[in-house]
Structures are given as structure tokens and as C-alpha cells.
Amino acid sequence: KLLQKYRRNVGDERVKRIAEETPAKISAIAACDHVPRKKEEYIPVYVSCESEEASEVLCQKDGIQGIYLPYALIEKHLQTGLDNGKEMYLSLPHITRENPPEGYMEQVKKWLEAGLSGFLVRNLESYSALAQMGLADKCVLDHSLYTWNDEAIRFWKDQGILRNTVPLELNEKELRHRENAGSEMIVYGRLPLMHSAQCVRKNTFGCNGQEERLVLKDRYDKEFPVVCYCRPWKMGNTKAAESCYNIIYNSLPYGLLKEADRVKELGVSSVRLAFTIESREETERIVEDFVAAYHGSQVSHEYEFTKGHFKRGAE
């Protein structure tokens, strides 16, 4: 109360000033909260996958537009995916602290000639290397590369990228203010809680370089999957790298299954299902239900999903 008379109403002053300068823009932004964008009945579904057994299913599954796979799985399934009419993309490392192994880029060039559509890019180092090779137009930016606002989106568009991924931190209201026409949105997956250079496997049992999966339990007995990336470039003939890392994932998967109609109203160009530790059976069931939901059909199963930041956003 003592300080109240010294406070100025910054919000009102700022709104008044902006409204005087750009009335049309303010009106358009205000309207975004009330007028939904055109809802597409059919939206392309892409998938990313980290496991051998699940990737076999995905390459032959109907309703999937394209697949993102790491090096070892592209090596095995590129031709199968192409034969089944899928767009095939190479998933690059989440963290890059060294050059690709010998022979990596030479093989990638051969795959491009064979029909590889492009790359899922997770960091600026990978993007820079591809851009220098004249491959910026084949880059799909993952959610880890900054595209929170329209200015950032315009920057990347000027670089000539293929598309970007909607940030995981924005809520539904914020996404309605974002230009999503060239964006892909993740609607299923285990969200990463932490990328760590401190290997859980090494610190607990010692390093074996076998890219194992572990589980951390909290005091509530919730289980958090941990994936060891001993060979970030995923070339089978390479040794475990010093630049290895772990990703710790959430205990529950994130899923916007019942929200399919609301996602379509955001105007995104495609949606993505991100598979990490799922079994073959889980993968098949989840794909069928999400493809049905986003293509306007009935869903067959019930799931327990977290909604991530879709409802409340990040502060």
C-alpha cells in the first residue's frame, strides 16, 4: 500500500503506445485468441525412431509420410522405406562435440543419391556443417533449435531450410500467435528432462560402451528411462566416443491424442511421433491410434499421457 502511489501502470502505458503506433497489428493479435485457424482434416504424420524392432514396423506401416532414423537404422532400412513410399531422413546427434567418423559423410552422399530426403538436425554445429555442403534445404530443425517467435522463423526461412519443429515449451495460446505453416509439431514421445555428459551407467557400474538403457527411480517410485548414447553418430563400426552422453526421459510419455482437432487448428504442416524405448507392439498400437486421430477416424485404445507445456507453457 505504501508503494502503490509510486507505481505506474506499465501495462496500460505500453499497450496505449503500441496501439497508437500499430493499431492494425494489435487488432490482429487480439483476434488470434478468438478466431481459430482453418482446421485441416488430413495432416501428414512423420515418425522418429531409435530402436531396431520398432523401425522395422514403421517402414512398412500405412499412414506414415516419413521416417527419421539414426545412421545404423538408415543403413538397414533406407531402401525398405523408399520402396514403401516413405520419405526417409537421417537423424543426427543431439550433441556434437567432434567431427563425424571417417566415411560418414561419404556414405551420406550416396544415400542422398539413392533417395534420402534430408536430415533431422538437433544442433547448430550439425546445421552449419550441412549448410557449408549446400544442404540447408534438406534440413528439418528439431525442437532444440530456437524457433519460438516469428522473427526466428523468418531467419531460418531465409536460410532455406525444409521445415522447423514447434518448440515444446510453448502452450496452445502462444502457438496460436506463432506462424506454424512451415512447422512440424511433436504430438507423441518421451520428453527429455536432461541431456547429461555424466553417464549414469559409467558412474554406477562402469563403462561398457554398449548403449544400454537404464531406469532411475524417484522417491515416489516413478521410473525415468535413461538412454546411453555411447556412439552419438550411430555408426556400428566405431568405438565408444569420449563425447558420449545420456538422455533422461520423463516417466510418462507426452501425447496429444484427444487434442488432435485443436492441434490441427494451429496450422502446422505436419505432426511427429517420437519413439525411443517403445516395444514393437507399443509402437504399432500408438501409430495406428495417432494416425486415426489425425486423419479424422476413431481411436481404439486409452492412454495415460502428460500434456507437457501444451496447457500452461514454460516460464
Which stretches of residues belong to each language-model region?
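Active-site pocket-lining/capping segments in soluble small-molecule metabolic enzymes
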Residues: K1-E315
